[in-house]
Amino acid sequence: LVVASTTALADHAEPEALPGARLQPYPASALDLASIPFRIVYETFRETDGKENWELCLVHADGSNPVNLTRTADVNELYPHASPDGTKVCFVADEGTGRDKIRNVYYMNLDGTGRVKVAENARQPCWGPDSQTIAYLKAEFRRYTITDYATKELMYYDLKTGEHKPHVNKDLHHLYNICWSPDGQWFVATVHGGMGHDHAILAFRAHGTAVYDLTKFGVTGCRPDFGPDGRKITWGMTDWDLGVADIDLNGAEPMVTNVRPFVKCDKEHETYHTDFSPDGQYIAFSYGPKANEMVGGQAPGWNICVSNLAGTWVQITTDGLQNKEPDWVPAPTKAK
């Protein structure tokens, strides 16, 4: 069941400029990020053993104390997502060369040890709220591509049993950037040329078949992410505008209100890949000159930024090593 939008915004109008908005990052001193107890993991293109490749880097919220978690010269690790308990990271790895190249889903401990393959020829993984389940999308084709929407079917992987189960809605396809709600009942994602949609942000049930197009609420663009309590979402409104809104998933259908931009950059740069901090007070994102924002796409000069919800944003990396896809790492849950 697909519930289509009937009152979409005309031509996806560009968001209004923020009052007094700054189109470039503020000075680093504008936000006190050193006091934040959470860290950030992201993909970065840098040299390992004399060879440039994609690695996963972990930093403090202010960009300090960088650690290369992967250090694999012959494997490209990308698209990291930290588990809600702060102990693990799921990601994709591009392995092989030429026609044998393939994108696979893995997870590992936060320190880079204990790597486990989840699925071959799969992509776009994210965690369930129990930190024991990973959702991922099967690749649409066997031949390697970085095209973000080249996906079909959503799967669940149980870390304890190793079992894979399909989502009940077998019609899910051409999705990307799936995000699982904190209560475990919903996903939000982008669809491109699939399921009766051209390009839209969707909400759909984790254990049902209903799919809802959020376009009618003014939620247009791509790559949505839930806030930590499931009552806010953030996403990219355009290449230059990042949005945030309130979302209510407790009724018969999703409702989105208070849609607003919070960061805007100049047209020579782009902003992508928003992610809420575990306390809901900050949003991390990627920023840099016009480039390929897709997972594994080349983006020279891109850095990781952090903003508060009022739109004060700063760069936390400055090396421009194609730093993208930031994901906040919660403080690890202590064992009882």
Question: Where in the sequence are the language-model features?
Answer:
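Bacterial N-terminal signal peptides
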Residues: 1-4
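Sequence signature of WD/YWTD-type beta-propeller architectures
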Residues: 11-336
